[in-house]
């Protein structure tokens, strides 16, 4: 099945295929809808919009083919190049996304929490995301104020505030989580 590259997103216009992707892993978001519960998916009649990193993940697994508006296939290599051209730190962000997905988590945008990702154990509408992930650029420090801000954010939304980065020399994903505790 295919999706069409449109700017920074890949649009799955086949509604049935979009529903299947969403049901199987909560990939993307339906155009015009916010959080959709699994039991509501069959009532949705809208295209599914995937972020570039989601589309790349599905392309790597042979689940999705990405094409241009004219139907020309975009290779996996070209999709990575486009990600690098359009998004700062695309490689690192994708590695973090892939890291959580490969562990079986559902990874959604964390924008409403001021974060890169919200990470669910089961999925939106089933459980609450126990973790918000903020990207820490490689070779960039973090201040005590940033940590305090993150801890407050995590506490206010009752989630673990997690810093994620990718080591330049090894490509390893490194996580550092903060949770509030009563002492």
UniProtKB/Swiss-Prot annotation:
GO terms for molecular function: lyase activity; nucleic acid binding; tRNA-intron endonuclease activity. One of its GO terms (cellular component) is cytoplasm. The active site is at 120, 128, 159. It catalyses: pretRNA = a 3'-half-tRNA molecule with a 5'-OH end + a 5'-half-tRNA molecule with a 2',3'-cyclic phosphate end + an intron with a 2',3'-cyclic phosphate and a 5'-hydroxyl terminus. Its EC number is 4.6.1.16. It comes from the Archaea. One of its GO terms (biological process) is tRNA splicing, via endonucleolytic cleavage and ligation. Pfam families: tRNA_int_endo (PF01974), tRNA_int_endo_N (PF02778). Keywords: Lyase, tRNA processing. InterPro entries: tRNA_endonuc-like_dom_sf, tRNA_intron_Endo_cat-like_sf, tRNA_intron_Endonuc_cat-like, tRNA_intron_Endonuc_N, tRNA_intron_Endonuc_N_sf, tRNA_splic, tRNA_splic_arch_short. Homotetramer; although the tetramer contains four active sites, only two participate in the cleavage. Therefore, it should be considered as a dimer of dimers. Endonuclease that removes tRNA introns. Cleaves pre-tRNA at the 5'- and 3'-splice sites to release the intron. The products are an intron and two tRNA half-molecules bearing 2',3' cyclic phosphate and 5'-OH termini. Recognizes a pseudosymmetric substrate in which 2 bulged loops of 3 bases are separated by a stem of 4 bp. Belongs to the tRNA-intron endonuclease family. Archaeal short subfamily. This is tRNA-splicing endonuclease. It comes from Pyrobaculum arsenaticum (strain DSM 13514 / JCM 11321 / PZ6). The lineage of its organism: Archaea, Thermoproteota, Thermoprotei, Thermoproteales, Thermoproteaceae.
